[in-house]
Every structure is written in C-alpha cells, then in structure tokens.
Regions:
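C-terminal segments of large proteins
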Residues: 1-167
Length: 167
C-alpha cells in the first residue's frame, strides 16, 4: 500500500477467530525495510528484509496511530507490526508493509519499474487529471494515451524518463 507521508493514516482493527470485531490495546513497531530483492513468504508474496527499527508506540483499536509518526518518516518502504494479547492471554501479532512517498519526490521512493500514484484520474470535461508517474529504470521511453469515457483517444505522447517522477 502506498501512502503520502503528509496524509498517511493507520487504524488497527482486531477480530476474534470467529471474525467478530473486538477491542484491544497493544504496541506497534515500525521498521524501515531494505530495498534489496525480496524473499518470498510461504504464500509466494514478497517479504522484504528489515533494515532497522524506526519507531515504537501503543495503540487502541479503532483509534488512529498519530499521523505525526508517518509525517516524520522519509519516503521509503516500511513494515508496521502490531502486537496484543488475546482473551486467553496469548500474544497475537500482525504486520503490514507500506510505502511512504512525498508528492515532491523527484524519483520513486523505492526501486520500481513502474511507479504510479493516481491523484485525480476520473474527470468531467474541462477538468484536469492529476497523477504521478515514475520509474527507477534509466533512459526509458513511455507511451501514454488519454481516452474519453467512450474509448476515444484524445492524446498520445512519447516521453523519456530516467530514474525520475513526472506529474
């Protein structure tokens, strides 16, 4: 998941084994992750290595983790790990990887062949679309096309990018 660091939000939700919402309190840890080629977990999903611990705190389900926590972090790949205790006193944990970016970044926040942030892509006639497109690759040629709702191409352009973002 990608989040802009100025507006990033996280709310922890807990469920029982029967998938019923429950309340919980616990701790969270945020780690920065390595940009190296990831390993695969047992389900085949990418699993990035932890680079270092960057912050810790506490949470109560249903309440936001302070947005200031995310604003203070530089653009990059992170893992949020939450821990709590269930009704039987057993420790439970979950984690979620995410990417923080800043709209003013000159290049993608992590190595990516295709970096796309949709800011405003469904528009009324005369309204401007806004998105950020980038690549970590060097000397790339990108063909972009803009279509109307009835599939008519209104613009086609070839642009060159080299480890950069464009708005």
């Amino acid at each position: 998941e990608e989040m802009e660091n100025d507006s990033a939000k996280a709310v922890v939700t807990a469920y029982t084994v029967n998938r019923q919402k429950t309340s919980a309190e616990g701790s969270y840890t945020i780690y920065s992750l390595s940009d190296e080629k990831p390993e695969k977990d047992m389900f085949g999903a990418d699993r990035y290595k932890i680079n270092k611990l960057v912050t810790v705190g506490t949470f109560i389900t249903g309440y936001e983790i302070s947005p200031a926590v995310f604003r203070e972090l530089p653009a990059g790949r992170y893992r949020l790990e939450v821990k709590s205790t269930d009704s039987n006193g057993k420790e439970v944990s979950a984690n979620q990887d995410f990417i923080l970016y800043n709209r003013q970044d000159k290049r993608p926040p992590v190595f990516m062949h295709t970096w796309l942030v949709n800011e405003h892509t469904t528009c009324a006639p005369g309204e401007e679309a806004a998105f950020i497109f980038g690549t970590s690759d060097k000397d790339t040629h990108i063909l972009y096309e803009i279509y109307t709702a009835d599939n008519k191409c209104t613009e086609r352009k070839l642009i060159r990018l080299s480890d950069e973002n464009r708005t």
